[in-house]
């Protein structure tokens, strides 16, 4: 296995983030749009070695292959199901995917030119440890980057859901990512990266359009059970789920053609590992 990986075999099949085919219509397609812009803004030199931590279905890895001109991309995720999905979806020989814990990455130190993570940090029990691991596996002078959704305001497809759910069920407010994940704010992300010893830390917004053909295209992914909002929707009795659907239909914006024009904002953070590269390193 490349780069001295010690593959872990933890199976996360029962995790709410374990089914790649259900994740794609809910978040995956929008994540790909953000990932492409995220990689472009990193402005990393070609022929580098990249690590994609919490690779999921491979959105960031594919963006790196498409635009980053890497020599190699290694993706790691705690979910064996996602790892298998990424392997099937991405056949590029420069990419490989392994199971691994973001808090104890299965890679040696200082092996990557770039280490990144997309839409993962806020779900981890110890984000600071994960960022420290990203820094550890990055070579001196290399780039570390991540992005998370702006759940509190700018991730509109989820924001409308929780506002509607909370109006019908006060319990839903406790599950709202905008409340649960204060990490997903610029000041918290900056402090997280600075605390890991990274230098030149910057945080910026990435906004992408998320247009749905009609309300059914917007609503159906919430029935896939992938992530907090869909998990909540599928936990409801049928009558209460129908009431939530009706309220959402009433509050989301509709264009004249029946489509639903929304946008999704992610906060992207990046920094460099201090120190200079060694010759030939």
Predicted feature residues:
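Conserved Class I S-adenosyl-L-methionine
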Residues: 13-19, 57-59, 179-281
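Class I SAM-dependent methyltransferase Rossmann-like catalytic core
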Residues: 17-29
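Conserved alpha-helix/loop element of class I SAM-dependent methyltransferases that forms part
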Residues: 29-48, 63
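Class I SAM-dependent methyltransferase SAM/SAH-binding core
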Residues: 49-105, 128-129
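A short acidic, Gly/Pro-enriched loop at the edge of an enzyme's catalytic core
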Residues: 103-114
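A short SAM/SAH-binding and catalytic strip from SAM-dependent methyltransferases
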Residues: 113-127, 150
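Conserved catalytic/acceptor-binding region of the Class I
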Residues: 128-129, 135, 139-213, 229, ...
């Amino acid at each position: 296995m490349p780069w001295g990986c010690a593959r872990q075999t933890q199976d996360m099949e029962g995790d709410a983030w374990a089914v790649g085919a259900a994740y794609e219509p809910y978040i995956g397609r929008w994540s790909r749009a953000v990932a492409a812009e995220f990689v472009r803004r990193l402005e990393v030199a070609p022929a580098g070695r990249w690590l994609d931590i919490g690779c999921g279905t491979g959105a960031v890895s594919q963006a790196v292959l498409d635009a980053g001109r890497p020599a190699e991309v290694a993706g790691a995720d705690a979910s064996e199901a996602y790892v298998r999905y990424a392997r099937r979806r991405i056949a590029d020989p420069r990419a490989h995917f392994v199971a691994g814990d973001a808090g104890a990455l299965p890679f040696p130190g200082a092996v990557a030119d770039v280490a990144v993570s997309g839409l993962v940090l806020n779900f981890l029990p110890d984000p600071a440890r994960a960022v420290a691991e990203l820094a550890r596996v990055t070579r001196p002078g290399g780039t570390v980057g991540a992005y998370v959704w702006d759940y509190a305001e700018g991730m509109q497809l989820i924001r409308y859901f929780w506002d509607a759910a909370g109006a019908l069920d006060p319990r839903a407010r406790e599950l709202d990512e905008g409340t649960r994940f204060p990490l997903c704010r610029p000041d918290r992300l900056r402090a997280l990266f600075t605390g890991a010893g990274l230098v030149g830390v910057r945080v910026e917004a990435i906004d992408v359009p998320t247009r749905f053909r009609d309300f059914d295209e917007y609503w159906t992914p919430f029935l896939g059970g992938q992530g907090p909002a869909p998990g909540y929707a599928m936990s409801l009795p049928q009558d209460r789920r129908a009431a939530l659907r009706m309220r959402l239909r009433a509050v989301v914006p509709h264009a004249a053609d029946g489509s639903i024009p929304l946008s999704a904002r992610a906060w992207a953070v990046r920094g460099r590992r201090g120190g200079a590269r060694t010759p030939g390193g």
